[in-house]
Amino acid sequence: MIINYELNPPKILPKDYFSYSNLLDNIDNVKKKVKILCEYSHSIHFTDSVLGIPRISSITMANIIKKYNDSIKISCSIRTRDRNLTSMYQIIFDPILYNIESLLILLGDQPRNDLGTHNLLKPSKVVNLFNSQEFKKSIKLNLSIPNKIRNINNTVQRKIDAKPYAFVTQSIESLKDLENIIDLIRPFDIKVIACIMLPSQKNKRSAELIGLNWQEYEKEPIEFIRNCGRIADEVLLTSPNHFTLATEILKELR
């Protein structure tokens, strides 16, 4: 079973003002977490300004980590909401240069101070374009997919047509939901990476924000993760507010 772990880069304005020294301290905290995770996780995935809250870019954070340990496998999320096509070309070159494993291209959440949502780049169009231009030979390009799929609608079909290396699910609620996704996607020769949020009181607010109901696996998260790992190509664990729990579970899964 391939288990990856998701980390959020530090916030740029954690207290509504910028402090360079605080930012450096928070970067050091991420470094410490990565050092621990390397013992138990196949790779690290850095998010890109989750919930529209400005953070150090995933690519910058990956480069910082790579500078002190280039052997660590890292993947990154990239939001298209904040970028035009020119900046996407600039962005895709950097992870290739830094030897990053893959990119998850996604629209991203709307920032609180967003002035508009016109002419947004669709992630599927970006992946389709970059794949047609042979970027896929240098880096894996992934797309996100809902945690529940009953059939292949137009939105899912467009993502399939983009031919990503893998689909990364939104946080999975049940094994049956994951089985449905895999049954629908596997015929297209696209891998499925199951994202799972660890159930914890400290993570409850994060779960509520994305409408996640972890009732099915709350009491037996390790068994649930193992079952998901048996049918998905990879598992991506996330525990945004409870890192100690994450390390405990990763040790048991090792």
Q: Locations of the language-model features?
A:
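Active-site-proximal loop/turn and secondary-structure-junction residues that shape catalytic pockets
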Residues: 7-11, 48-52, 80-82, 107-111, ...
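Active-site-adjacent beta->alpha loops and helix N-cap segments on the catalytic face
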Residues: 52-65, 83-90, 109-132, 150-152, ...
